[in-house]
C-alpha cells in the first residue's frame, strides 16, 4: 500500500496532507483563528513594497522612473502636434537632446516655436 501526499507551501510553511485527510485538515487550517492566510499575505506584500536602503540613501523604485519617462514622451508628442514644420521640430529635438536639457526647456522652446508659427500665419 502506498500513500499519495500533497505538499502545500505558503510563505516558508510546509504542510503535508495525506490523500484521505486532505479536506479535513485543510478545513481545520482555514477555520483556525491563530493561522490567518490573509494576514500573512498582507505582511508579505508590505515587505516587498518597502524601498531598498542603500549606502547613498533610499533607492527609488524603477516603476516611477518608467512612468515619468512615458509621461514626458506623451507630453512631447502632444506639443509636437501643434507645429506643422517637421524639420523645425526635428532640429529642436536634436539640439535639446545634444545639450541634455530638461523636458521643461524643450516644451518651452516648442511652445515658442508654435506661437511664432501662428503669428506668421
Curated annotation (Swiss-Prot):
This is Putative uncharacterized protein C959.11. Residues 64-76 have a biased composition (Low complexity). Residues 38-76, 91-121 are annotated as: Disordered. It comes from the Eukaryota. Residues 43-63 have a biased composition (Basic residues).
